[in-house]
C-alpha cells in the first residue's frame, strides 16, 4: 500500500527505485530490506526499511517498479528473504541447485559444489 501511495501521490511522486538491499540482523527480528526511492520530478528521496523474522514474507513491489524484479531476486538469492506475489522469484546469481543463501550470518560455505572445491577464503585465488 505504501509503495502505490508514494508513486501516485502528487506531493511525493517517487518514480525511481534507486536501490533495494537486504540485510541480516542475526537476532529475533532476523532480516531487513531497505528501499531507496527518488522523485525525478520533485528532486527528493526517501528510504524505507522493513524488518521481519526469519519465516515472514515481504510483499513484492515488482508490479509497481519493474526494476524491483531483479533487486528482489538478488535479495532472495543471497539472503533467502521471500517476496510474496513476485512474478518469478528464483535465483539470479547462484545456480538453481545451490544450497543456502551466502550472505546470511549463519551460512556455512560447502566444501564442494558438483564435485568442485568451493574456496572458503581469498587465499584460494591469491
Give residue ranges: language-model regions:
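Terminal low-complexity/charged segments
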Residues: 1-126
Amino acid at each position: 500500500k505504501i509503495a502505490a501511495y508514494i508513486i501516485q501521490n502528487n506531493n511525493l511522486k517517487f518514480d525511481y527505485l534507486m536501490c533495494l538491499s537486504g540485510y541480516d540482523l542475526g537476532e529475533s527480528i532476523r532480516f531487513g530490506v531497505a528501499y531507496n526511492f527518488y522523485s525525478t520530478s520533485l528532486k527528493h528521496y526517501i528510504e524505507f526499511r522493513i524488518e521481519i523474522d526469519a519465516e515472514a514474507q515481504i510483499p513484492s513491489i515488482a508490479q509497481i517498479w519493474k526494476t524491483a524484479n531483479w533487486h528482489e531476486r538478488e535479495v532472495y538469492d543471497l539472503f533467502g528473504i521471500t517476496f510474496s506475489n513476485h512474478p518469478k522469484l528464483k535465483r539470479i546469481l547462484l545456480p538453481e541447485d545451490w544450497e543456502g543463501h551466502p550472505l546470511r550470518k549463519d551460512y556455512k560455505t560447502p566444501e564442494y559444489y558438483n564435485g568442485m572445491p568451493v574456496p572458503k577464503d581469498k587465499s584460494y585465488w591469491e
